[in-house]
Amino acid sequence: MERIKPRTLSGFMELLPAQQQQMERVMDILRTTYSRYGFTPLDTPIIEASEILLAKGGGETEKQIYRFSKGDSDLSLRFDLTVPLAKYVALHYADLAFPFRRFQIGKVYRGERAQRGRFREFYQADIDVIGDGELDIMNDAEIPAIIYDVFSAMGLKRFQIRINNRRVLNGFYSMLGLTEQSGEIMRTVDKIEKIGPDMVRAILVDDVKLTGEQADE
């Protein structure tokens, strides 16, 4: 009988005991901090119906998910915690009190090429506030405080919190007289880490038809 060589699949992680203890400490800090700010813990299935996970993701999402069939069921492993949250709220809407403040810490799976810093199985630690109508902007302002408390409790001394808020951005674009182009501008600026500021500026000028001065601002 051929011997089977033990191995861990590429992009998946197994921790040694000391590393797992460190991981548990991080998880405890997250749970404690999130709970202190009034967020309720939530857990959702790792496996969902493919039609739910792919409802809004399009072809790019389909390339990333682990998808399989069991009998007549078309199933997939969750690739984030946001889509399962949307399903959960839609399913249990009548039983929830709004604004619904939840946190969820769990593994997600993405079938993309494993590389340094990018895994196929990894944890996400989400906090979300779901409103029944418009939410007070104070909910957005609270998030940086939570991040600061989490990182400080972990012993991190130097870190940056980058804020990306559509209301603030829309106000800025409105000030520049670019309200109609705001959606296209935001989609382009989101690519800045992938393609660099020079390419983003070129797209804003050539495709979105901004002036050079507007693109620089």
Where in this protein do the model-derived segments appear?
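Extended, charged alpha-beta segments that form solvent-exposed binding/catalytic grooves
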Residues: M1-E217
